[in-house]
């Protein structure tokens, strides 16, 4: 099975230009927020070498996500050549399968992060290194470059090492990140937080970076922000809120610290942030310790939101209702993704959007 991504190591708009809808100089790049129109979504097919006996179940989850996203927008799924046929059969004709070598399915982290110019798109290659060398990544380390070459999209090689799941934008000049997944020697040896922040601002055209502490060394990602907090729109942060009966551990402490930071922070427009709590499920049954039970790892698609369902009916209904209120006019679809969750990841972790130009 893939290494657990949550509990254990074992198992861009620029604020100075004004508010929403403001004109941007032609020579500036920005990272659009996820709710902006997509050209398509990229995904990747899990390999048996990484997932072992869990492979079939994880592939069912990935195929289910791909088919669902394809109801809203085009999907391109990367697969090793020998497995492309199986991927096509599982995902159906609405999903394009392309033979690009991969190690694992976490396209949010291995794929390029797309930024916009006035009339073009470019891809930031964040130099994926297996979450700091914790997992074999010979193929995944080349995925971003391969995608951009195949699509004939300009590649921007980052001067830092990071993963897409470590970064969250409001599309209006603000970035939200966990320090634990960026300021560490397994990714950026010898680099200070200030140096990394300068690189992030340049890469994504942001002017404000909000840092929360995160958790170092307890999961393979060192606690990505997309399992903790998301922007639903400029000025609104959706936070994965532990239930009252949750144990006092490093994860609840990380939430408490992040909540204090977000409550005090201002965005690139100089405005305070509103926090919307998205409570985690109370009952997750017999799932393992590394199971990722958070609803904020949803994915916003054209006209919809694809989010997890965990089987705690009260919590599932409440989460869907909150997300509908956050994204009015979008269809909310909940999917069971238990096999993916046992690997410590979720729907957002397995997808990567390419923004529409124009």
Report the location of each language-model feature.
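The feature marks the mature, well-folded catalytic cores of soluble enzymes
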Residues: 26-358
């Amino acid at each position: 099975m893939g290494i657990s991504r949550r509990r254990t190591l074992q198992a861009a708009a620029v604020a100075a230009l004004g508010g929403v809808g403001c004109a941007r100089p032609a020579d500036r790049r920005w990272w659009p927020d996820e709710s902006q129109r997509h050209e398509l979504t990229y995904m990747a097919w899990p390999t048996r070498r990484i997932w072992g006996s869990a492979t079939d179940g994880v592939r069912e989850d990935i195929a289910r996500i791909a088919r669902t996203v394809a109801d809203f927008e085009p999907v391109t799924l990367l697969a090793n050549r020998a497995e492309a046929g199986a991927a096509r059969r599982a995902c159906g004709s609405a999903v394009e399968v392309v033979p690009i070598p991969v190690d694992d399915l976490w396209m949010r982290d291995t794929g390029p992060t797309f930024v916009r110019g006035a009339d073009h798109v470019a891809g930031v290659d964040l130099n994926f290194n297996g979450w700091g060398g914790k997992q074999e990544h010979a193929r995944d380390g080349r995925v971003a470059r391969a995608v951009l070459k195949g699509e004939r999209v300009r590649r921007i090689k980052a001067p830092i090492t990071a993963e897409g799941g470590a970064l969250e934008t409001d599309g209006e000049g603000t970035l939200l990140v966990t320090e634990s997944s960026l300021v560490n020697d397994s990714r950026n040896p010898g680099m200070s937080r200030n140096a990394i922040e300068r690189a992030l601002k340049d890469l994504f055209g942001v002017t404000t970076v909000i840092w929360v502490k995160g958790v170092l060394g307890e999961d393979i990602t060192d606690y990505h922000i997309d399992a903790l907090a998301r922007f639903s729109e400029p000025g609104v942060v959706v936070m994965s809120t532990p239930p009252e009966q949750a144990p006092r551990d490093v994860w609840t402490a990380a939430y408490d610290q992040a909540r204090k930071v977000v409550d005090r922070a201002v965005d690139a427009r100089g405005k305070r942030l509103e926090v919307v709590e998205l409570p985690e499920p109370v009952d997750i049954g017999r799932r393992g310790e590394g199971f990722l039970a958070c609803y904020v790892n949803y994915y916003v698609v054209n006209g919809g939101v694809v989010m997890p369902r965990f089987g705690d009916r009260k919590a599932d209904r409440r989460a869907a209702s909150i997300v509908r209120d956050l994204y009015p006019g979008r269809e909310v679809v909940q999917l069971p993704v238990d096999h993916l969750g046992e690997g410590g990841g979720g729907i957002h972790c397995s997808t990567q959007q390419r923004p529409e130009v124009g």
